[in-house]
Curated annotation (Swiss-Prot):
It comes from the Bacteria. The keyword Lipid metabolism applies. The keyword Oxidoreductase applies. It comes from Salmonella typhimurium (strain LT2 / SGSC1412 / ATCC 700720). This is Fatty acid oxidation complex subunit alpha. The gene is fadB.
Length: 729
């Protein structure tokens, strides 16, 4: 053994070939600060071996290196810019030493090689991969850019266009595509990986392969003519501006850095990468996006822990076909859980099956599946008008009309047709689970399971624990949701649960703005372009359905009369009374027409102004800041109340529910991350300017306490240790 660290070791393999093996404790390898330091120490040993002829890098895990240790990011990003820059220089000196070894080097890459893992293998001369490879640089999705030389080496290896596509979009690619673009040199079966790697190294050692020529382009300026460079970078900047926009600075910074570094050799180019990385790491956007990643890991880990002793349901059923029922049936079948879809008439069943078939055909058109797979999946969705087969189902989700009487009747009837241990769930969006459970003999086997539309796209499923729901019931439904590829978040019961409970105060803020003379078009524009929502409130109401929102608004007002009961006729009432139900009938706040692809496209409709004039004061202009404050304060206050009341268990789960269920702008990180970023005291000062608008604008006492004591909602993060100690961590 030449060297042994905590996460890697170095040893002789054969005939002057050494192997450097990543083998961290636990299930995966990460390129954390300690591993970078250890890699440097291993290279120091290697540089003294005069009989060294070649080096093989490999992993003892199912994945090569899954990336940097993102749990370190928040503390690393808090160190002063100069100190972070020094550490990056140190890390890059390690990868440069790997690249500069006087012998051929090869990385045998299995499974994932992402972020720092990818940057590590870019420093070797050759890369051999297994068919399960996923390799790429996802850093821009975290609000940063590659910092270990990825933005320097990748363009010089692949050419500007392919590298820009991967780096700017934060993409990873599979083995076949990686081979096609030159990111790897060969693909072999797992059992042949080491044998193949040694064979390539031997060819390089004997001179049959020119490893020096392979290495040289990575050390030089990017080979692009002025015209080629202008075309590549202009197109890339245009695409990034269109897709990322102003709220996500990392992709544009990466493109501009690669452009600026193109005329330099490795050292100068790495310096430019460093100068671009460090300011990005100190942005609120980076902290928010890293926070989302960590929250996602936390939420998924919590679900995994909850279901560790539970068998995933093997047979499911959906009550109520239609678009929602068909979407749930498709998602379950697509992920391998057969499903019975029951309704009371053929028309609804046909609608549900058509929806499932449409979604499968989209997969076929995109080349994700073939006809055989499509037929196989659709055959596991069984439409029926009766309860045949319900004695075999493990879990049933009810997705009928949002009416408590109908839901109670359907659930009570179904309870008599299933096994005693079968779990029943309701896809209600607002009706308290306790109310629906009152119709059941076994309420302990019942809970809420709130999917979001469209089911196949929206990652969140709210799992609602009723007062009598058993732990096993919750665990079974969480297991099914996880199997469906969803992110389940368990919340406690109340009208609207978590997501809709906090959404309707936001809509109430919108209604009050319109009542006071705001133009809904400007409100939509400000909330989309300035705050960053994917849709403004008027557009969102049209998509949800004005009739649906009108009904839900009444349910919420009954549940929380002290805050959500209004004493005036609002825009939602006016549109509902005029049968302008939104996208579903082509008229809402906006008018909708189908485009060439059959998708609804919104247009202005002057007729709506006359309608809204009846419920509004004369038009007046509001500043962007005032619109954002009046829209967001009711939502933020209600989110805080939900945490204080135990409806949602943690800031992390609240923020992920908002991002995954409502599209809360990820660059803000969620409501609690947004609060922590600006500070509770600053938020309180802003909110107090609007408390005259009513109870929805009154800041909860818990938040006032946070402001008084300057306390964040997330645990404080300490800056990483000084760079000197990071080197030898």
């Amino acid at each position: 053994m030449l060297y042994k660290g905590d996460t890697l070791y170095l040893d002789w393999l054969e005939d002057g070939i050494a192997e450097l093996v990543f083998d961290a404790p636990g299930s995966v390898n990460k390129l954390d600060t300690a591993t970078v330091a250890s890699l440097g120490q291993a290279l120091e040993v290697l540089e003294k071996q005069h009989d060294l002829k070649g080096l093989l890098l490999r992993s003892n895990k199912a994945a090569f290196i899954v990336g940097a240790d993102i749990t370190e990011f928040l503390s690393l990003f808090l160190v002063p810019e100069e100190q972070l820059s020094q550490w990056l220089h140190f890390a890059n000196s390690v990868f440069n030493r790997l690249e500069d070894l006087p012998v051929p080097t090869l990385a045998a890459v299995n499974g994932y090689a992402l972020g720092g893992g990818c940057e590590c293998v870019l420093a070797t001369d050759y890369r051999l991969a297994t068919p399960d490879l996923r390799i790429g640089l996802p850093e821009t999705k975290l609000g940063i850019m590659p910092g270990f030389g990825g933005s320097v080496r990748l363009p010089r290896m692949l050419g500007a266009d392919s590298a820009l596509e991967i780096i700017a979009a934060g993409k990873d690619v599979g083995a076949e595509h990686a081979l096609k673009i030159g990111l790897v040199d060969g693909v072999v079966k797992q059992e042949k990986l080491i044998e193949g790697a040694i064979a390539v190294l031997r060819q390089a050692i004997t001179g049959d392969l020119d490893w020096r020529a392979k290495r040289q382009p990575k050390l030089e300026p990017l080979k692009l003519s002025k015209i080629e460079a202008a075309m590549s970078f202009t197109i890339a900047k245009g695409m990034v501006a269109q897709t990322a926009g102003k709220h996500y600075p990392a992709p544009m910074t990466a493109v501009k850095t690669i452009e600026a570094a193109a005329r330099f050799g490795r050292e100068e180019a790495l310096n430019l990468e460093n100068k671009s990385f460090v300011p990005l790491a100190h942005t609120n956007e980076a902290r928010a996006l890293v926070g989302i990643f960590l929250n996602d890991q936390y939420v998924k880990g919590k679900a995994k822990k909850l279901t560790k002793d539970i068998e995933t349901p093997k047979q499911a059923a959906v009550l109520g076909a239609g678009i929602m029922g068909g979407g749930i049936a498709y998602q379950s079948a697509w992920k391998g859980v057969p499903v019975i879809m029951k309704d009371i008439n053929d028309k609804s069943l046909n609608l549900g099956m058509t929806e499932a078939a449409k979604l499968l055909n989209k997969q076929l058109e995109r080349g994700k599946i073939d006809g055989l797979k499509l037929a196989g999946v659709i055959s596991t969705i069984h439409p029926t008008l009766d309860y045949a087969g319900f004695d075999r189902v493990d879990v049933v989700v009810e997705a009928v009309v949002e009416n408590p009487k109908v839901k109670k009747a359907v659930l009570a009837e179904t309870e008599q047709k299933v096994r005693p241990e079968t779990v029943l769930a309701s896809n209600t969006s607002t009706i308290p689970i306790g109310e629906l459970a009152s119709a059941l003999e076994r309420p302990e086997n019942f809970c809420g399971m709130h999917f979001f539309n469209p089911v196949h796209r929206m990652p969140l499923v709210e799992i609602i624990r009723g007062e009598k729901s058993s732990d096993e019931t919750i665990a079974k439904v969480v297991a099914w949701a996880s199997k469906m590829g969803k992110t389940p978040i368990v919340v406690n019961d109340c009208p609207g649960f978590f997501v809709n409970r906090v959404l309707f105060p936001y809509f109430a803020g919108f209604s009050q703005l319109l009542r006071d003379g705001a133009d809904f078009r400007k409100v939509d524009k400000v909330m989309e372009k300035q705050f960053g929502w994917p849709m403004g409130p008027a557009y969102l109401l049209d998509v949800v359905g004005i009739d649906t929102a009108h009904h839900a608004q009444a349910v919420m007002a009954a549940g929380f009369p002290q805050r959500m009961q209004k004493d005036y006729r609002d825009a939602i009432d006016a549109l509902f009374d005029a049968s302008r139900f939104g996208q579903k009938n082509g008229l809402g706040f906006w008018r909708y027409k189908e485009d060439s692809k059959g998708k609804p496209k919104k247009e202005e409709d002057a007729a709506v102004d006359d309608l809204l004039a009846s419920v509004s004061q004369p038009k007046r202009d509001f500043s962007d800041d005032e619109i954002i404050a009046r829209m967001m304060i009711p939502m933020i206050n209600e989110v805080v109340r939900c945490l204080e009341e135990g409806i949602i268990a943690s800031p992390a789960e609240a923020d992920m529910a908002l991002v995954y269920g409502l599209g809360f702008p990820p660059f803000h990180g969620g409501a609690f991350r947004w609060l922590d970023t600006q500070g509770s005291a600053k938020y309180l000062d802003m909110a107090q300017q609007y408390q005259h608008l009513g109870p929805l604008y009154e800041v909860p006492e818990g938040l006032r306490n946070k402001a008084r004591h300057n306390e964040p909602y997330y645990p404080p993060v300490e800056p990483a240790r000084p760079v000197g100690s990071l080197k030898t961590a």
